[in-house]
């Protein structure tokens, strides 16, 4: 886990969510130092934002696919 101010764009939704869940468990556990907990919280915010971005992208893609399929009845691979 890195505590940088940015998040690698290539991290998958599933990886980010798993790391976020681990951070929540550690913070809830209460065994981390204050500084470590704050750094973990900061990383958690980055991961949450990344997950929200990935979900939004997926939703928009699904909406696009649905509109194309509804309007034409045919969906070409190049349209997606």
Curated annotation (Swiss-Prot):
InterPro entries, per the entry: Exonuc_VII_S (IPR003761), Exonuc_VII_ssu_sf (IPR037004)
GO terms assigned for molecular function: exodeoxyribonuclease VII activity
Domain of life: Bacteria
Cell location: Cytoplasm
Principal subcellular localization: cytoplasm
GO cellular component: cytosol; exodeoxyribonuclease VII complex
PANTHER family referenced in this protein's UniProt entry, alphabetically: EXODEOXYRIBONUCLEASE 7 SMALL SUBUNIT
Protein task: Bidirectionally degrades single-stranded DNA into large acid-insoluble oligonucleotides, which are then degraded further into small acid-soluble oligonucleotides.
Protein name as annotated: Exodeoxyribonuclease 7 small subunit
Underlying gene: xseB
